[in-house]
Structures are given as C-alpha cells and as structure tokens.
A protein has these predicted regions:
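Helix-terminus/linker motif at the lipid-water interface of multi-pass membrane proteins
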Residues: 35-54, 123-130, 186-193, 253-286, ...
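Small-residue-rich hydrophobic transmembrane alpha-helices
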Residues: 53-113, 150-169, 263, 276-340, ...
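Short runs within selected transmembrane alpha-helices of multi-pass transporters and secretion channels
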Residues: 74, 143-161, 169-180, 198-213, ...
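Small-residue hotspots at the loop-to-helix junctions and early N-terminal turns
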Residues: 48-61, 136, 140, 199, ...
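N-terminal transmembrane alpha-helices
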Residues: 10-47, 61-76, 80, 105-112, ...
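Transmembrane helical elements of multi-pass membrane transporters/channels
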Residues: 21-40, 142, 153, 176, ...
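Hydrophobic transmembrane alpha-helices of multi-pass small-molecule transporters
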Residues: 65-68, 180-184, 210-214, 286-289, ...
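Short alpha-helical transmembrane segments in multi-pass integral membrane proteins
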Residues: 1-23, 81-148, 190-246, 302-367, ...
Length: 458
C-alpha cells in the first residue's frame, strides 16, 4: 500500500479530544493486563497452594525486567511509524513496519533463549528460596516460550497506536485475557498443572493476541499494512528503530533493577510491614499504567505532528497530555488516600497489615501525580526523536539516585517514610532535568524544521 488514510491522522482536529479518545483504550488495555496478571496469582494462590504462589511471585522481577525491555523497544517502533505517517511518507512507513516485525521477533527469540537457559542462574542471583526454586524455574521456562508472541503483540500495538487506532489492541487483549483466565482455571483445577499450568495459559493467550493483531495488520488498507511478501530488514530503518527503542527498553530494565534495592529496604522491616507494602504496592501498577496511556499518546501525537511540521500542535500535545496525566494521578492518588483501607481490604484480612500498608499509601497517594512531569516529558522528548539524553537523565535521577538514597538517607533514619519519600524526591529531581533537556531539544527541533523549510523554498 502507498496510501495514507486521513481518518486516523493526529495532525488535524481538536487535540484535547483526540488525545483523550486515543488514551482511554490504552489505559483500559493497561488496566486489563494488570487484572489478568492478578488473576494468575489469585488462581495459583487459591487452588495450587502457598508454595506454588511463592514460586510464581519470585519470578515477578524478571518477568517485569524482560517485558519492560520489549515495551521499550515497541516505543521506538511507535515513534518512528508516527513520524513517517505524519510526514506522509508511505514508503518509509512500510519499511518501518516490515523491519520492525523482524526486530521484534528477534528480540522475542533472544529473550526466549535467555529464559530457557538462564532461569536457574537468574533466580539464584536473587537468592530464591530452595523450596521455591524448582517451581520458579519451571514457570519462567514455560512463560518465556511466549516471549516471541509477546514481542509481536507489542509490535502490532505500537503500529496501531502510532496512527491513532487503540481500539483494536484493546479488543484483542480482552479476548486473549479472557482466554487466559479460562485456561488458568482449566490447567490448574482440572489438569492439576499448578505452576506450569498458569505459565502455559499465559503463553497460549500471548500467542492468540499476537495472531489476532498480526492478522488485523494484514487486512489494513493503508501504508502501515503488513504484507508477508514484503518482510525485509532495511538496515537504515532498523538502526533508527534500535536507536529509539533500545534506550527506552534499557531504561525500563534499569528501573526493575533499582527497585530491587528498594525491596531490600522494605525487607529490613518485620514481616507485617513487608506484607503491608506488598498489598499497597498493587496500587502502583494500577495508577502508573493508567497514567502511562497519556505518555504513549503524547509520543505518538508529537511524533506525527513533528513529522508534519506542525510545531504548534507539537507543543500543545505535550501540555495537554501532561495535564491529563497529572490530573488522573491526582484524582486516583487522592481517592487512594481517602479509601486506602478499603483498597487494601481484598488483599488481607489482618488489620495490622492494613495499618502497615497505609504507611506507604499516605506517602505515595499525594505523590503519584508528580511522576507525570517526569514520564510525560520523557515521552515528549522521544516524540522528537531524542532517546539517549532522556534515558541517561532518568537512569541517574530515578535509578542511581534511588540506590544512593537507600544507602544514605534511609540507612540513617531507617523509617518507612524515609524509604518511600525517595519516590517523589527522585521524580521531582528527574522531572526538573528532563524538562530542561526537553526545552533544549524542542528549540533545536524548531530550528531544524525552519532551516528545512527555508531550503525547500529555494
């Protein structure tokens, strides 16, 4: 295809409405993914016993680490497709789509190999308890069989989101997620597969979601359509995908590593505090992922409009997405402060554990909205094609800073508030640096476009 459909263009129309309409399905997709993951844990805990539950739980860090890398890689695909689509360069869009498919598949196969071969060493690295180790190794190996499929789903999601269609990925994720729940119950209760059953259900669901989204791309009547006869690795395009995607993926991976040090700080308290923290931490994923929908929308809208040379819409896209994400974080965080005990109740029946969880909520509830300034600005810089600078800043500000905080301020005071305050402090510090970098990058981008327009008139 060499056409460009106007219906999904982000370069025209009311921005506030468009960003909201694109972001809502993304937010629902993110929340559904969390709920489906929670269902895995619930089924194992309810029907397979505490050892199986512990085995699955002990793999969470590595699952987050590697899936985060794939998500970061897909962000690079999203930005590049949006850039070329906005610039109305159909051939470049097609090259990006077909090269990105191969890059994503290669990344998924690489992670599959790491999971199959390296699971024992990785789990021992975290001092996984010996009684949990066999189940954890089995879970990771079966779960990682689905990594190529997960990589392909993220690829398709990135392409559709880049052109403003976020409803299809939501539909396919809903179908796969419902299947995942049914298979969880079947494999664990009927087949008595325990840990392997939950992992197998996830793998099958990932294959289904990947198949659905790839099939949808083959039916598209536009330049971003997937044609298996055109699959070819275009080297210059591949380099651009990797330049945009690898820093984002590396950033997500480093976040997971930094959080290990924070968890070590939590583990230095008694078991009640550890349980309370685990219960309260469920709010993090729900609120972060809801806010994250506006970050992906921000990158897509900015990239399309930058490609189209519409600088006024580039700047407006950033401020509108920032306002939405900040507002959502403030509302959800405020609601958590008011209804925190009710939120924690489904996770524990012990009032002392709820009291411990509230200590985290009382710090984090008002702080979630601060993260919008950091994350939305990072997305904005990536929308302009800048990835290395924002990644270096966030690694220093939100990863290195957090580790240093744990070993200095927290080590000195050794209180729960002194540990949890590292989140808003690191977000504020990183946000200030990211905003300064974005202003610099935006001015450079404006100058580059103005020079390009001047040369075009000659």
């Amino acid at each position: 295809m060499s056409t460009l459909a106007k219906s999904k263009s982000m370069t025209e129309g009311p921005l506030a409405k468009q960003i909201l309409l694109v972001s809502l399905p993304l937010a629902l997709s993110n929340l559904l993914q969390i709920l489906f993951n929670l269902s895995d844990v619930a089924v194992v805990g309810r029907f397979a016993g505490s050892t199986a539950l512990g085995a699955v739980g002990s793999t969470a860090t590595f699952v987050t680490l590697f899936t985060g890398f794939l998500i970061g890689l897909s962000n690079g695909i999203n930005v590049l497709v949006a850039r070329f689509y906005g610039a109305r360069h159909p051939k470049d869009v097609s090259k990006t789509v077909h090269s990105a498919l191969l890059v994503s598949l290669a990344a998924g196969v690489l992670l599959l190999f790491i999971g199959l071969v390296g699971s024992p060493a990785l789990l021992r690295l975290l001092n996984t308890k010996e009684d949990l180790l066999p189940g954890a190794i089995l879970y990771l190996r079966v779960y990682f069989l689905g990594m190529p499929a997960l990589a392909l789903y993220n690829f398709g999601n990135a392409v559709f989101s880049a052109i403003g269609d976020t409803k299809k990925p939501l539909t396919y994720l809903s179908i796969a997620g419902a299947l995942n729940i049914v298979l969880n119950l079947f494999f664990v209760i009927v087949c008595k597969l325990d840990v392997a059953g939950v992992a197998l259900a996830s793998t099958i669901a990932q294959c289904v979601s990947a198949g659905l989204i790839l099939h949808a791309l083959t039916k598209v009547r536009d330049c971003y359509a997937l044609d298996f006869h055109k699959i070819k690795l275009d080297i210059p395009t591949t380099k651009r995908i990797l330049l945009l995607g690898i820093p984002a993926g590396f950033q997500n991976a480093v976040f997971a590593i930094a959080n290990l040090f924070i968890q070590a700080g939590v583990n230095s308290f008694d078991s009640l505090m550890v349980k309370g923290n685990s219960a309260a931490a469920n709010a993090d994923a729900l609120i972060y992922d809801a806010m994250a929908a506006f970050y992906m929308a921000c990158a897509s809208f900015m990239s399309q409009n930058y490609g189209a040379g519409k600088l006024d819409r580039v700047k407006k896209s950033y401020f509108i997405a920032l306002a939405y994400s900040f507002g959502l974080g403030a509302v959800l965080g405020g609601g958590l402060l008011v209804f925190g005990r009710q939120f924690l109740a489904p996770f524990t029946t012990e009032s002392v554990v709820i009291d411990a969880g509230m200590k985290r909520i009382l710090v984090m509830g008002w702080a979630y909205c601060i993260s919008a300034f950091m994350d939305c600005t990072i997305a904005a810089s990536r929308g302009l094609g800048r990835t290395i600078g924002p990644t270096v800043i966030v690694i220093l500000g939100s990863c290195v800073f957090r580790v240093a905080w744990v070993y200095t301020i927290f080590a000195h005071f050794h209180t729960i508030p002194s540990l949890y305050l590292l989140y808003p402090c690191s977000w504020a510090l990183t946000a200030a640096a990211e905003i300064a970098y974005f202003v610099f990058a935006y001015r450079q981008s404006v100058q580059r476009l103005q020079q390009h327009d001047a040369l075009a008139r000659l």
